[in-house]
Design a protein with these regions (language model features):
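Glycine-rich beta->alpha junctions and the first turn(s) of the following alpha-helix
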Residues: 1-41
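Functionally constrained cores in energy, signaling, and assembly domains
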Residues: 3, 8, 33, 50, ...
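Predominant activation on well-ordered alpha-helical scaffold segments within soluble catalytic domains
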Residues: 8-16, 72, 76-79, 118
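Generic structural signal for well-ordered, non-transmembrane alpha-helical segments
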Residues: 9, 34-41, 65, 69-76, ...
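Generic structural signal for short, solvent-exposed loop/turn connectors between secondary structure elements
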Residues: 20-33, 48-61, 116-118, 122-125
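C-terminal helix-coil-helix/basic helical segment that borders enzyme active sites and/or dimer interfaces
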Residues: 23, 41-73, 80-92
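Glycine-rich phosphate/cofactor-binding loops in nucleotide/flavin-utilizing enzymes
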Residues: 89-125
Length: 125
């Protein structure tokens, strides 16, 4: 849950920073932003769902691991959207966007890695 929360926070910040940049030519990316916000809201709702008490332990583990995987994928997508909208200034090493980019780049290899999560989920089906 803690790792999901980190990914959730990273995605939230990138989506927040991206929204005011959706103007002019960049408006062509508005649908991506809307989709990511919808995914964010859905994942947040699933993570905060109080119906877990009705599930068996394997179902709870499967759902939490799936949420962790999906939040990591969303964070990477949200940060990439922010970078596209920021343009070259996003890559300045002192920028918050650059820091989020480095954090998102680490997510697929953060233990449990994306490969490990997918493997575990495949075994739990």
């Amino acid at each position: 849950i803690l790792q999901s929360s980190f990914c959730q926070g990273l995605a939230a910040r990138s989506l927040e920073e991206s929204e005011p940049l959706l103007k002019g030519q960049s408006i062509v990316l508005a649908d991506d932003h809307i989709q990511f916000v919808d995914t964010f809201n859905n994942l947040t709702s699933r993570m905060n769902d109080d119906s877990y008490s009705k599930l068996d332990i394997d179902e709870i583990i499967r759902e939490l691991l799936q949420i962790r995987l999906e939040f990591a994928q969303l964070a990477i997508s949200a940060v990439n959207l922010e970078l596209k909208l920021q343009g070259g200034r996003a890559y300045a090493t002192s920028s918050a966007s650059s820091r989020r980019f480095r954090e998102a780049a680490f997510l697929p290899i953060q233990a449990p890695t994306e490969v490990q999560l997918k493997w575990i989920l495949s075994q739990l089906k």
